[in-house]
C-alpha cells in the first residue's frame, strides 16, 4: 500500500501542475487509519521475519535490528516480490523516512525503537517523519506565483521526505567510498615502496653478477696465459719456498735480538766520567800482559779452563766498546793457588779505542820485603793481584813507568759497569793472607783532570801522591836477585794461542819454557 501512497503523491504533483490550466482544485490525499501500521513497515517486518530469507536478510543477534547480508540478491529477489521494484537505494531512503538508523557503517544493519522481533504491534508507534525544510521551500517561492500558493500541503511534505531519504543514502555511500579509497591508497603506497626496494635489490644483484662474470673472465684468461708458460709451476713453487724461508728467518732473528737485549743491561755513562769495570780475570790479565810486553797490537791469549788449578781463570773475551773520551778501571781478584809453587802474578791493563802508538813498559817481580811497605802505606787499597809466596827481587826506578792518561781511555764493558770516581780502581773485597799490587794507572799522574767523589774519598784515609816518599822507598827497596820469575808478566805476552783442551801439566810446562826463553832475551837486551 505504500507504493500506492507514493504514487498518489506523484499524482498530486501532476495535478498541482495542471491545476492552473484546468482551474480545478485537487482532491485531498487519503489519510491512513490511525490504528493500522504503515504498509511499508508491515511488508518489511514480514520479509525480515521469514526464515527462508535468513541468508539474505535476517534479525541481528540482539533482535532489535535487521541486517541485509547480500544487497545484490536482496535487490534482485526480495524487493520485486514485496515492493514491486528492485532499487536498493530507494529502499534505504524509505527506511530513513520512518526513522530507521544505520547501526554499523561497514554493513547494512538498520534499527528502530518500534521495530523489534516478536513485537509486531509496536509498528503502530512508528510514524513518517516530516521534513523541517518543507515550509522554508514554500517561503522561498515568489509571492506573486499563484500556482505555488495553490499547492496542497500533502504534496510538499512528500517531496521533502524523498529529498531527505536520498541525501542520507548518498552521504553514507560517499563516506564508505572515502574510507575504502583511503585504505586502497595506503595499500598502494606500501606496494610501491616494496616495488622500489625490490627494484633496488635487483639492480644490486645484476651489478654483482656482472662483476662476478668479469672477474671470472679475467681469471680464465690469466690461467690460460699462465698455463702456456713452461716455467710457471716451478717459479710458483720457488716463490712459495722463499716466502716460507723468509718467515722462518725473521722469526729466528727476532728471538736472537730478544736474547741479546736481555743479556745487555749495560748503561753508557756520560763523557768525562770514570767507569768501574770488573770483567773476568782472564780478560783483564791478557789486557795487562799486552801493556807490559810493549805490544802495539798483541795477540790474544786463548781461554783456559775455569778450574781453580788453571793459570788463567775465566773464559771471557775482552769487550771494549766505549768512546775515546772515557776512562775505565780494571779490577782483578786474587786467584787462590792450589800448590806450593809460586804462580805467575796476574795484572790488569786498560786499553781503549784511541791508544797511543807507543806503549809504556812496566816490569814487576815477586816482592819479599816490599810487601810490608805496601801494607803500611796502602792500608786502604785492596789488593787486586797477589801471590802466596813473594820473593825478594830488584826493581829499578827506570823500569817503573806510569802509563799515560790517554792509555786508560776507551774501555766500556757491556756488563758490570758503574759510573764512579777515580778511586773505583780499587776492589773492596779483600782476601785474608794475600798481598797484591794494584796498578793504579794514570790516576796518579799530576795532569789528570778527574772529578773525585767525596763519598768514595772518605773510604781512603791516605792515598800516596806522586811526590810521596812511599814511592821512593818502594822503588829503592832491596829485592832478591832471584830473577827466575823476574819478568813473568811480560813473558806471557809472547805466548802463542793455546787450546782450551790442554790440561794443567801441559800449561805449566809450556809456560816455563816460554819464560826461560824470554828471560834470556831480556837479559841480552838489558846488556
Swiss-Prot record:
<dbReference type="Pfam" id="PF00447">
    <property type="entry name" value="HSF_DNA-bind"/>
</dbReference>
<keyword id="KW-0010">Activator</keyword>
<comment type="function">
    <text>DNA-binding protein that specifically binds heat shock promoter elements (HSE) and activates transcription.</text>
</comment>
<keyword id="KW-0804">Transcription</keyword>
<feature type="DNA-binding region">
    <location>
        <begin position="39"/>
        <end position="133"/>
    </location>
</feature>
<comment type="subunit">
    <text>Homotrimer.</text>
</comment>
<feature type="compositionally biased region" description="Polar residues">
    <location>
        <begin position="317"/>
        <end position="326"/>
    </location>
</feature>
<dbReference type="GO" id="GO:0006357">
    <property type="term" value="P:regulation of transcription by RNA polymerase II"/>
</dbReference>
<comment type="similarity">
    <text>Belongs to the HSF family.</text>
</comment>
<feature type="region of interest" description="Disordered">
    <location>
        <begin position="297"/>
        <end position="341"/>
    </location>
</feature>
<feature type="region of interest" description="Disordered">
    <location>
        <begin position="128"/>
        <end position="158"/>
    </location>
</feature>
<dbReference type="InterPro" id="IPR036388">
    <property type="entry name" value="WH-like_DNA-bd_sf"/>
</dbReference>
<dbReference type="GO" id="GO:0005634">
    <property type="term" value="C:nucleus"/>
</dbReference>
<feature type="region of interest" description="Disordered">
    <location>
        <begin position="241"/>
        <end position="273"/>
    </location>
</feature>
<feature type="compositionally biased region" description="Low complexity">
    <location>
        <begin position="134"/>
        <end position="152"/>
    </location>
</feature>
<keyword id="KW-0805">Transcription regulation</keyword>
<keyword id="KW-0238">DNA-binding</keyword>
<keyword id="KW-0597">Phosphoprotein</keyword>
<dbReference type="GO" id="GO:0043565">
    <property type="term" value="F:sequence-specific DNA binding"/>
</dbReference>
<dbReference type="InterPro" id="IPR036390">
    <property type="entry name" value="WH_DNA-bd_sf"/>
</dbReference>
<keyword id="KW-0539">Nucleus</keyword>
<dbReference type="GO" id="GO:0003700">
    <property type="term" value="F:DNA-binding transcription factor activity"/>
</dbReference>
<protein>
    <recommendedName>
        <fullName>Heat shock factor protein HSF8</fullName>
    </recommendedName>
</protein>
<dbReference type="GO" id="GO:0034605">
    <property type="term" value="P:cellular response to heat"/>
</dbReference>
<keyword id="KW-0346">Stress response</keyword>
<dbReference type="InterPro" id="IPR000232">
    <property type="entry name" value="HSF_DNA-bd"/>
</dbReference>
